[in-house]
């Protein structure tokens, strides 16, 4: 029986889950929006929300705790400088999960995880080029 067992295994070992969530958290903080499967999205939300709360604390110990979880000092710097100040007055609820249909290959449920008041310019040059190409195709 699995009474009281919280969290999903996602067909991965504990070390693989830990590494995957660290990478997903870093990507989410960097780009402020990611597309993933719905179960992974539901698992990553509390992890990143706790990281944002660490960023709002802002002290050295909180920064070291965030670095130990994400393992990327540049991402942690963005978390503590940009994201934590943006959500200084908000008490939780920093992320939103929106269902995004099903994946073509295996029909897995997809979801978009994004920050509530996200910076739309954080997606990067590759995404801007893709959006511009889509707008050109739609206009033509």
From Swiss-Prot:
PROSITE patterns membership: RIBOSOMAL_L17 (PS01167)
Signal peptide start-end: none
Keywords carried by this UniProt record: Ribonucleoprotein, Ribosomal protein
Entry annotated with the keyword Ribosomal protein: yes
Matching InterPro entries: Ribosomal_bL17, Ribosomal_bL17_CS, Ribosomal_bL17_sf
Gene3D superfamilies: Ribosomal protein L17 (3.90.1030.10)
Molecular functions per Gene Ontology: structural constituent of ribosome
Claim: Ribosomal protein is one of the keywords in the record: yes
GO biological process: translation
GO cellular component: cytosolic large ribosomal subunit
Superkingdom of source: Bacteria
Subunit-structure text: Part of the 50S ribosomal subunit. Contacts protein L32.
Family: Belongs to the bacterial ribosomal protein bL17 family.
PANTHER family noted in UniProt: LARGE RIBOSOMAL SUBUNIT PROTEIN BL17M (PTHR14413:SF16), RIBOSOMAL PROTEIN L17 (PTHR14413)
Matches recorded under HAMAP family: Ribosomal_bL17 (MF_01368)
Name of protein: Large ribosomal subunit protein bL17
Organism: Rhizobium rhizogenes (strain K84 / ATCC BAA-868)
């Amino acid at each position: 029986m699995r009474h009281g067992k919280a969290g999903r295994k996602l067909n991965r070992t504990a070390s693989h889950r830990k590494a995957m969530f660290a990478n997903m958290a870093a990507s989410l903080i960097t780009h402020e929006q990611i597309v993933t499967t719905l179960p992974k999205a539901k698992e990553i939300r509390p992890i990143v929300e706790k990281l944002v709360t660490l960023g709002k604390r802002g002290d050295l110990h909180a920064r070291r705790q965030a670095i130990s979880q994400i393992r990327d000092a540049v991402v942690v710097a963005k978390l503590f400088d940009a994201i934590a100040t943006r959500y200084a007055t908000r008490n939780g609820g920093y992320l939103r999960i929106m269902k995004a249909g099903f994946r073509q290959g295996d029909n897995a449920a997809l979801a978009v995880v994004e920050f509530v008041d996200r910076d739309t310019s954080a997606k990067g040059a590759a995404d801007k080029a893709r959006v511009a190409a889509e707008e050109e195709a739609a206009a033509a």
